[in-house]
């Protein structure tokens, strides 16, 4: 009986240790700020069809690499030392709420110069899952 319980527990642990990453459609936008001046940048809300999501944590796989894509693009455009974040959601409605909240924070105060990074000049490329 002990062997049966032990082997069942071992199987359960091994199954939960490997969380599957599944491609999914997500909506995302990027935000960049510089600590050197008062300029902030927003990308458009973009739909990415094949972004990988960790099925266990529901978190975007390799999110930092999406932020690096934005950082590299802004540096090519002459933006000095941008600090970038990428925000995602599974529904258009949720991402629009997040976008509006963050944008309002920077436009209402009048302290920041808000710039747009439009879709034709910048689009997120899906990050491939690597095991």
Identify the residue ranges that each predicted region occupies.
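Sec-dependent N-terminal signal peptides
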Residues: 4-15
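Generic structural motif
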Residues: 4, 34-36, 92
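Surface-exposed, polar helix/loop patches in the mature regions of secreted/periplasmic/lumenal proteins
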Residues: 79-131
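Positively charged n-region of N-terminal signal peptides that target proteins for export
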Residues: 1-4, 19
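Tryptophan-paired
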Residues: 60-75, 79-80
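Acidic/histidine-rich, surface-exposed loop or edge segments in extracytoplasmic proteins
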Residues: 48-53, 75-86
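N-terminal secretory signal peptides
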Residues: 19-64
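Intrinsically disordered, low-complexity boundary segments flanking structured domains
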Residues: 17-18, 69-75, 101-102
């Amino acid at each position: 009986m002990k062997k049966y319980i032990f082997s069942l527990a071992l199987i359960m642990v091994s199954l939960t240790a490997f969380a599957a990453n599944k491609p999914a459609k997500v909506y995302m936008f990027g935000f960049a700020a510089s600590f050197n001046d008062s300029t902030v940048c927003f990308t458009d809300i973009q739909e990415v069809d094949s972004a990988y999501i960790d099925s266990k944590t529901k978190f975007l796989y390799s999110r930092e690499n999406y932020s690096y894509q934005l950082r590299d693009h802004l540096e090519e455009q002459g933006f000095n030392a941008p600090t970038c974040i990428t925000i995602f959601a599974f529904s258009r409605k949720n991402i629009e709420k997040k976008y509006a909240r963050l944008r309002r924070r920077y436009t209402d105060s009048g302290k920041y110069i808000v710039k747009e990074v439009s879709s034709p000049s910048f689009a997120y490329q899906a990050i491939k899952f690597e095991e």
